[in-house]
Structures are given as structure tokens and as C-alpha cells.
Amino acid sequence: MKDYLRHIWYWICKYPLSLLPNNIFFNLQYNIVCLRHGYKHRWLNINNPRRFNEKIHWLKLNPCIKDGEFLADKYRVREYIKNTIGEKYLIPLIGVWDKVDDIELAKLPNKFVLKANHGSGMNIICKDKSQIDWNKAKNKMRFWLKNSQYCLSREWQYKDTPRKIICEQFLKDDITDYKFFCFNGRPKYIQVDIDRFKCHRRSFFTDKWESAPFTTLYEQPEKMPEKPTQLEEMLGVATKLAKDYAFARIDLYIHENKVYFGEITLHPEGGCGIFI
């Protein structure tokens, strides 16, 4: 059902809504999200931004990162990670393909993760190869390659990305996700996501691991996450990766006491995240 609704929304964005100027499209999209969650909607002041989402939308309208297309590409960004913080932070890559039919299931390990390189929310997590519906998976990946994330959110960094499917090593089930919100190269807040695919809980901390003065519509965990022993290392990694940018969110994981790079996000949730 979720995929079906995504297809409908993509068609709406690609055709009738494509006629709207960016400012109106952004406000329509933001208010649809607000209404869907029963949250008070408001008109975004993009020209004179004061709130976080307004500033994210300003950055969408005013690209100021010369290599943003490179950073947003989940395949090409690996070279930046290798050169900036070292190859040890990369999740092992199993394969990369331009065409879905070139992917041979028999040659993949029993557990793996398939992703599109040119957007967000396009993942297939396989924990047992014998249980995967491969035809369904291939149809989903064909849809990914056929369509552009730019149509959904008008994020400029996705507009001309060469589309590929990548396969990475599966780390573990329900791995904790640490997302570092970096302003002018400095990590200020940390979003922690737990049990994303079962009972998703989210909490926010400062860089000192103190509770942040805001949250989102996601419920917070009953027991707040403990400060990870690798926090200082992760803060250092986030600082190095975000040092040249007005804003970037650096996503990291911890697996078997090792820090791994997830992705660099320039416009979290397309500027439509709801903070309370």
C-alpha cells in the first residue's frame, strides 16, 4: 500500500504539480505533511527564513554547495568518504548496477541491503535470501531507476544524478541510527533513531549528550539511549565531513563497536519534518 501511494504521489508531483513555482510547491507539500499528522499548518517564509524548515527550503532554492550532487549520490560519495575520513568507515560494497536485470540474486550473500543511489527511502533489506520475492523486488527497483527524487521534493542535488542500484553488506537488524545536524561545519544536535522497522522511536540530544529542547512527532523511547562510547569519534567524523557546508546532516551507525558512515543529507525530510 505504501508503494502504491508513493507511485500516486510521484505522478501528481511529476505532472499537475510540476506547473507550480517552487515557492508554492514547497508550501503545498509542507502543509500536506502538517495536515496528515494533525499539526497546525503555516505558510513558510522562505525569503526571510527564521525556522529550521524555512532555512532548509531556502537552501533548496539557493544552492550553495558546489559538489552537492556528488555528496547526495550514495555511490559516488564513497570516494569522498574514503579520501576525507578513511575507507574503514565505509559499509562494504557488494555490487553496483545500472540495470536491474544485471543483478544476479544467486551471486548475492544470504543477507544484503539494496539501495537506489539517487534519493531517500529507497531500500530493500534482505535478511534471508530464500524468503525474498525477487520479482517484486526487481519491479520496485525498476520504479526507482525510472523516476527522480527531484520530482518529489525539488531538491536540486538529485536532478541529474546518474541512477544506479547499489548493494551493501547487511550489518544487523534494527541498528541504531545517529544523525548529526551540523551547522557551519559544527555538529550541534544528534537525532537517534531506534527500531526503525518495528517500533520506531526517536530522540534528540545536544553534542554534549543532553536532551535537546525539542522533539518530533515520533514517540520517544521509554528508556533514553545511553551515551555511546564512540560519541567523540562520531563528532569528529561529522565535523570533518561537514566542515565546508552551511548545513549538512551526517548519518552514522555503530556496529560491533565500529563507526560506519550512512549518508550525507543536505535537506532533512525535504524541509518538511515537524518539530515540536
Residue ranges and their predicted role:
Residues 160, 164, 202-259:
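A long amphipathic alpha-helix within ATP-dependent nucleotide-binding catalytic cores
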Residues 45-131, 141-156, 164:
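A conserved helix-loop-beta module that forms one wall/lid of the active-site cleft
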Residues 125-126, 199-205, 271-275:
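A short, polar/proline- and glycine-enriched secondary-structure boundary/capping micro-motif
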